[in-house]
A protein has these predicted regions:
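Flexible "cap/lid" loop of the alpha/beta hydrolase fold
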Residues: 96, 102-133
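Structural signature of beta-strand start/N-cap positions in the alpha/beta core
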Residues: 13, 39, 80, 102-104
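Conserved catalytic-core motifs of eukaryotic protein kinase domains, centered on the activation segment
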Residues: 27-28, 51-56, 116-118
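Helix-loop "lid/cap" segments that line or gate small-molecule binding pockets
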Residues: 136-146
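Gly/Ala-rich beta-loop-alpha elbow adjacent to hydrolase catalytic centers
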Residues: 83-91
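Active-site signature of alpha/beta-hydrolase-fold catalytic machinery across serine-
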Residues: 29, 93-97
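Conserved HGGG/HGGXW glycine-rich cap/lid loop of the alpha/beta-hydrolase fold
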Residues: 4-50
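Active-site loop/oxyanion-hole signature of alpha/beta-hydrolase fold enzymes
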Residues: 41-82
Length: 146
């Protein structure tokens, strides 16, 4: 994992956790604008960019590495953080750990695990899969949805 920094001369801090398979350039315009007044930390997951090879292993390991990196840079709190999809799961984990204060957090479509017994989770999975298959195979359902 790598963390790219932009706008290091600014005091306000903002962390970006991207979604799965999100290339670095996807945040280029946003980072260019925000780095004019914020110190931006942009997370690049292992295996998500040719320059940063490796395999993404886990949300937990990523969050631990991000916290460790920020603390090594003298950052003890963040003014803001953004996480999209898998990045939302990373941000949710970071908030749950409570190891670093985050002033504002935006969780965009964060994936979170069900806190239910195994059998109930499997039944919910079966329901979801069946629902998607029925919707995908039924013109009437698709027309009603859209």
């Amino acid at each position: 994992m790598q963390i790219l920094e932009h706008g290091q001369e600014h005091g306000r801090t903002l962390l970006f956790f991207p979604c799965t398979a999100e290339p670095v350039w996807a945040f280029d315009d946003t980072v260019a604008q925000l780095s004019q007044s914020w110190h931006i930390f942009q997370v690049v997951y292992d295996g998500h960019q040719p320059e940063y090879p490796g395999d993404f292993t886990s949300v937990e390991q990523t969050v631990d590495a991000v916290i460790s990196y920020l603390k090594s840079c003298g950052i003890s709190q963040l003014d803001g953080a953004y996480g999209c999809s898998m990045g939302g799961a990373c941000l949710t984990r970071m908030l749950a750990l409570g190891e670093m204060t985050i002033g504002r957090a935006i969780i965009d479509g964060g994936i979170t695990p069900y806190q239910l017994p195994f059998l109930v989770r499997k039944l919910l999975l079966a329901r979801d899969v069946l629902s998607f298959k029925m919707a995908a195979n039924s013109r009437k359902v698709l027309e009603a949805a859209f």
